[in-house]
């Protein structure tokens, strides 16, 4: 396919137009008085949202050169969302400012590589100062504050804080749709994995269709159980103890499953069997997690163990186990606390070392199951549109709260970025780099300026007054008052602010040093080839409908 090429000023100007179109759309949502944006959906009702990354991902411009600029800023938002889970609009505003101011200087003859060097130096200094003024997020009240600022709702902040209080900072917190109009928090204590009972005849509660086991023994193996004789000696010992038994195995088939069910129905013993969670190597790791949690030994060939070798010492214990058709929940496993802590640390090390997003996600799930319970926030609303919008806000609040716990918090509303300006201005940079430093100094003001203007105030006036205030004093755009931001509960996670600045600076510096841009040339009709294919007559497709 033929290509169009643009060079130097023409190339950068086209990309700036795209950057501005996306950023101007996103930045209207910033702050407590930010507006919403309505997104058309191909099916269902439109989505009304003020979530920056959701808006950015929807934008695709007709002009290919402008679209490249827009997609670069969209990447800033996405990267910030991936790292910190929030701060996407702030990152977009910072990127627009750096690109816009940078292009003015490049057009005036400044050295793009010198500007890039200055941007990197100023960003590094700003990040250092943000970390210096950061305070830890340790109390439940602080988590409420972080969640409230992110979502714009104190109630949402309370849900997040309650959930983290129940399951721990590393615990699993999921966000689901509620069938009612009220939002509620449901906490599942202990470890849960997505495998249910192998036979409905194993249930003990016919109304809930659940099997409840009190103080059960737990047999864990990665083997398939086909012959009941393999575990018969062990079953006889469990019967003598008059305790229920949970069997977690690769599978149970042949004569083994009917025999277990028959003895359960006759009342010989109370047993529930379930398949092992996960697949392949991940299954082995998850079985070992369960074993550590319950104090069991995994019956596996890796350890040279056979099912017939299993003894009562091989079994784990728990205070309670609940099994339904889809899930198994183990509450208060009897594993050694030191062994559990060592296992948690091992998984944390694996999370830090892995380069695969998928592996990292699965490792974090395992970590959460070991480190805490499972909390479910069920989001209710009067309409589907409202429910979608609320879910996005709760997701942002949850991510912000976790980021706050991880790296602490700073004054919110863009105040912290203005607070570090004086330290960044002290940088000793050469003539080319000082231009880049000044570009970052200007960008650090932009979030406060945009928040103020969205609330109907003059941004430049607010910034000048803010620069003369003591550390921690800032402008509450919701009320129009000057307050101690932390005392007023207006805080941002340090990780969110840091990630927004670093990602914005990184992409913007690269864009400023761009000298040529290459894009596919549209076809003769003025449409993209891809767009033209969408209107193809169904009769031209190779075959009719079946």
From Swiss-Prot:
GO terms for cellular component: cytoplasm. It comes from the Bacteria. Its EC number is 5.6.1.7. Residues 521-546 are annotated as: Disordered. It holds the Pfam family Cpn60_TCP1. Signal peptide: none annotated. Keywords: ATP-binding, Chaperone, Cytoplasm, Isomerase, Nucleotide-binding. GO terms for molecular function: ATP binding; ATP-dependent protein folding chaperone; isomerase activity; unfolded protein binding. It is an enzyme of class 5 (isomerase). InterPro entries: Cpn60/GroEL, Cpn60/GroEL/TCP-1, GroEL-like_apical_dom_sf, GROEL-like_equatorial_sf, TCP-1-like_intermed_sf. ATP binds at residues 29-32, 86-90, 413, 476-478, 492. The keyword Chaperone applies. It catalyses: ATP + H2O + a folded polypeptide = ADP + phosphate + an unfolded polypeptide. One of its GO terms (biological process) is protein refolding. It is found in: Cytoplasm. PANTHER family: 60 KDA HEAT SHOCK PROTEIN, MITOCHONDRIAL. Together with its co-chaperonin GroES, plays an essential role in assisting protein folding. The GroEL-GroES system forms a nano-cage that allows encapsulation of the non-native substrate proteins and provides a physical environment optimized to promote and accelerate protein folding. Belongs to the chaperonin (HSP60) family. Forms a cylinder of 14 subunits composed of two heptameric rings stacked back-to-back. Interacts with the co-chaperonin GroES. This is Chaperonin GroEL. It comes from Tetragenococcus halophilus (Pediococcus halophilus). The gene is groEL.
